[in-house]
């Protein structure tokens, strides 16, 4: 699974996922399914905000990469992918600027057009079940919830899907592609089944114990994408870099 993730996701997304797991004390070498899930969620959040801007009239417009209208305001603020301290700093800044109610839990995005925080969900299960779990956890009508599945289904608060149909179709197509690529490599069943995931986790722990005494080689390589991203992370105009087109899965 780890090899699949590194082949099928943008290096920037992979490194952000690595940092997230490290922050929470999780080992991506063992919890490979979680590694894949985090990368998938990050990519969906980035795709959700791709190309969406607000013009001078306050209207939401779609601008493709390379368009000269660089001074347009980005419609979405990406919160997901930041370390917790920085993420809460961004949330507090948004609340102070817009008057939005501070959420109890860290959301994934902020929509400047609709003036609301957004929680993005990507599920391997039924969308309505995952939606209810999210709603019960958040317990706030102020945070908008939007759930996507790997089967092309989606569910959103009050059936308000925020994005246009084409933008949502891009996300659904990407998720379906990830599912197909996992299935072709025999990875989908373990990814979708908690029982199989636990079995793989135990197997990984046992394997790690056996290999603990072996010499290891640590890679110090940093992807060019992340080198560009890091100094721009606090810049409100960093989106062109952040929204770098995601790598497609190579054929088996």
From Swiss-Prot:
**Which source organism?**
Influenza A virus (strain A/Puerto Rico/8/1934 H1N1)
Annotated protein name in UniProt: Protein PA-X
Q: Does the keyword Cytoplasm apply?
A: no
Show which residues form the site (Important for efficient shutoff activity).
28, 65, 202-203, 206
UniProt remark on domains = The probable endonuclease active site in the N-terminus and the basic amino acid cluster in the C-terminus are important for the shutoff activity. The C-terminus acts as a nuclear localization signal. The C-terminus is recruited to host protein complexes involved in nuclear Pol II RNA processing.
Per the UniProt record, one Pfam family is: Flu_PA
Give the family, as the similarity comment puts it.
Belongs to the influenza viruses PA-X family.
Gene3D superfamilies linked to this entry: Influenza RNA-dependent RNA polymerase subunit PA, endonuclease domain
An individual GO BP term: viral RNA genome replication
Q: InterPro entries given for it?
A: PA/PA-X, PA/PA-X_sf
């Amino acid at each position: 699974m780890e090899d699949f993730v590194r082949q099928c996701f943008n290096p920037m997304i992979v490194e952000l996922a690595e940092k997230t797991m490290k922050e929470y004390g999780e080992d991506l070498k063992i919890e490979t399914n979680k590694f894949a899930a985090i990368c998938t969620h990050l990519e969906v959040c980035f795709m959700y905000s791709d190309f969406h801007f607000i013009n001078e009239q306050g209207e939401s417009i779609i601008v493709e990469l390379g368009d000269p209208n660089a001074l347009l305001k980005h419609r979405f603020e990406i919160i997901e992918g930041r370390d917790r301290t920085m993420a809460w700093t961004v949330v507090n800044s948004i609340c102070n600027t817009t008057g939005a109610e501070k959420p109890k839990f860290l959301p994934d995005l902020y929509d400047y057009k609709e003036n609301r925080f957004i929680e993005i969900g990507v599920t391997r299960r039924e969308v309505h079940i995952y939606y209810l779990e999210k709603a019960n956890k958040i317990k706030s009508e102020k945070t908008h919830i939007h759930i996507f599945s790997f089967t092309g289904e989606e569910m959103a608060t009050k059936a308000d899907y925020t994005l246009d149909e084409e933008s949502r179709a891009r996300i659904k197509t990407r998720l379906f592609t990830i599912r197909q690529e996992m299935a072709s490599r025999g990875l989908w069943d373990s990814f979708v089944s908690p029982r199989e995931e636990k079995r793989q986790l135990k197997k990984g722990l046992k394997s790690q114990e056996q290999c603990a005494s072996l010499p290891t080689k640590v890679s110090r390589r940093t992807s060019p994408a992340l080198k560009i991203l890091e100094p721009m992370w606090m810049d409100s105009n960093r989106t062109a870099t952040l929204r770098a087109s995601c790598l497609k899965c190579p054929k088996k």
